[in-house]
Amino acid sequence: MTTTTTRFVQLAACAAASLLAVAASGAAAQGVGSVITQAVFNSMLPNRDNSQCPARGFYTYDAFIAAANSFPAFGTSGGSAELIRRELAAFFGQTSHETTGGTRGSSDQFQWGYCFKEEINKATSPPYYGRGPIQLTGQSNYQAAGNALGLDLVGNPDLVSTDAVVSFKTAIWFWMTAQGNKPSCHDVILGRWTPSAADTAAGRVPGYGVITNIINGGIECGVGQNDANVDRIGYYKRYCDMLGAGYGSNLDCYNQRNFAS
């Protein structure tokens, strides 16, 4: 190959790489990426790549955007800028708690989201222990998520903790999907959920608190004030403040019965 030909190939490769970078940047600048920019993502999760975090290097901005783009209604369909930003604050608030490496009561407690990608106690429900931003747990959830995403997550659950795009997709899938008598987190935060008579009797009212109930109500709800609720709310408020969104009402589930009761 001549020097001229080699130079041409190198230039072509550089041009192709530049086009891919521009395309990725353009995709990020639309939809969710218009609110959660790379800079905002880094500011929200400043310690995710800390040397103390087992998930360091895993949760990338590009992986989040790629996953979000697979769910066009996620973080884009609130009907107002306020609700769009509130949904994203709520999503990151809940998932940051699920993956937190923060120390309760410390000054930077709510700056340690996305520190973990796998549950610490893997004996909880092997091999379907918690993985990813939402800590997807249990064979039924791996089956349902896999069916929705076109992946064999029952046969290969480790995909959720080894492929960052898949990991984010499972979290967003859970967020967007109603299951049984539980509404979707998406509908709740956008004010599209109307409680049934049973919900009202159980104290389940629209707001961030019922999202906690959807995710982990069997442990955290109906038991009065507890550290987990406080942590979820703290992350949520921090992100609302960063994104310029109001908190809404009913932030906790202290007095709500869980959906299985």
UniProtKB/Swiss-Prot annotation:
Protein name: Chitinase 8
Induction notes from the record: By glycol chitin and fungal elicitor in suspension cell culture and ethephon in leaves.
Record has Transferase as a keyword: no
Species lineage: Eukaryota, Viridiplantae, Streptophyta, Embryophyta, Tracheophyta
Organism: Oryza sativa subsp. japonica (Rice)
BP GO terms, sorted: cell wall macromolecule catabolic process; chitin catabolic process; defense response to fungus; polysaccharide catabolic process
Expression by tissue: Expressed in roots, leaves, sheaths and meristems.
Active site: 98
Alphabetical UniProt keywords: Carbohydrate metabolism, Disulfide bond, Glycosidase, Hydrolase, Polysaccharide degradation, Signal
Record family assignment: Belongs to the glycosyl hydrolase 19 family. Chitinase class II subfamily.
Top EC class of this enzyme: hydrolase
Reaction(s) catalysed by this chain's protein: Random endo-hydrolysis of N-acetyl-beta-D-glucosaminide (1->4)-beta-linkages in chitin and chitodextrins
Gene encoding the protein: Cht8
Pfam families: Glyco_hydro_19 (PF00182)
GO molecular function: chitinase activity; endochitinase activity
Record EC number: 3.2.1.14
Alphabetical list of Gene3D superfamilies matching this protein: 1.10.530.10, Endochitinase, domain 2
Disulfide cross-links: 53-115, 221-253
Keyword Ubl conjugation: no
InterPro entries: Glyco_hydro_19 (IPR016283), Glyco_hydro_19_cat (IPR000726), Lysozyme-like_dom_sf (IPR023346)
Signal peptide span: 1-29
Coiled coil regions in record: none
